Amino acid sequence: DWTTPSCLPPLLPPGAVEAVQEAAPEAAEEPEEEEDDMGFSLFD
């Protein structure tokens, strides 16, 4: 859960959490995104 990371202390501001989610929101929620990345790689 991004809301309660066990490896990181709960001292991070909400901005940091949003930054992580914006960096890879679908990748974290939907592993299917990885398949799409592989598809894009093949197209490249």
From Swiss-Prot:
One Pfam match: Ribosomal_60s
The Acidic residues compositionally biased stretches are 27-38
Per the record, which residues fall in region Disordered?
1-44
User: Where does the record place Low complexity bias?
Assistant: 14-26
Tell me the protein's name. High molecular weight antigen
**What is the native source organism of this protein?**
Babesia bovis
